[in-house]
A protein has these predicted regions:
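Short, flexible loop segments at the rims of nucleotide/cofactor-binding pockets, characterized by
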Residues: 1-3, 38, 86-88
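Residue-level preference for short coil/turn positions at secondary-structure junctions
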Residues: 19-21, 57, 105
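Structural core segment of the AMP-binding/adenylate-forming
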Residues: 81-134
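A short N-terminal helical cap/helix-turn-helix that marks the beginning
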Residues: 3-24, 41
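Solvent-exposed, charged/polar functional surfaces in cytosolic regulatory/catalytic domains
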Residues: 14, 18, 45-49, 130
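Conserved AMP-binding/adenylate-forming core of the ANL superfamily
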Residues: 24-68, 72-76, 93-98
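Aromatic/hydrophobic pocket-lining residues that form π-stacking "cages" and hydrophobic walls in ligand
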Residues: 12, 73-74, 124
Length: 134
């Protein structure tokens, strides 16, 4: 097997340039469709946002989300910046999240609202009440 030296971000750029109008990502349950170019633009926008809040190469970024379009966007945006992706189990309770954030040295936590009996936003507000005002 031959390896190459392109990063995930470089592959995304490559396909966005060579097949910009070809459909890349479909979330049929949400009626969302992205071409390579559209998805790359979405990723670049997210990467700029992450960069603006201090995410850079080597920064640990947690993703606490279900299978939603933003999960993949965060993955690629972090990869373009050289960040370290830390996936968070969607079933975690607050004490498990607190341990993981500390143990994995998570700088930035990207979240969705939550699933089943857990509200991710409320758990984070309980851990860091000052975020409610920011």
């Amino acid at each position: 097997m031959e390896l190459n030296d392109r990063t995930i971000g470089q592959w995304l750029e490559h396909w966005a340039q060579t097949t910009p109008d070809k459909e890349y990502l479909v979330y049929s349950d949400r009626d969302l469709r992205f071409t390579w170019k559209e998805f790359n633009e979405r990723v670049d926008k997210m990467a700029k946002g992450l960069l603006a809040i201090g995410v850079e190469q080597g920064t640990h970024v947690g993703i606490w989300a279900t299978n939603v379009p933003d999960w993949l966007t965060f993955l690629y945006a972090g990869a373009k910046l050289g960040a370290v992706l830390v996936t968070v189990n969607t079933n975690y309770k607050q004490h498990e999240l607190e341990f993981l954030v500390d143990d994995a040295d998570i700088h930035t936590l990207c979240i969705t609202e939550g699933v089943f009996d857990g509200n991710y936003v409320d758990m984070v507000y309980t851990m860091l009440p000052e975020l409610r005002e920011s």
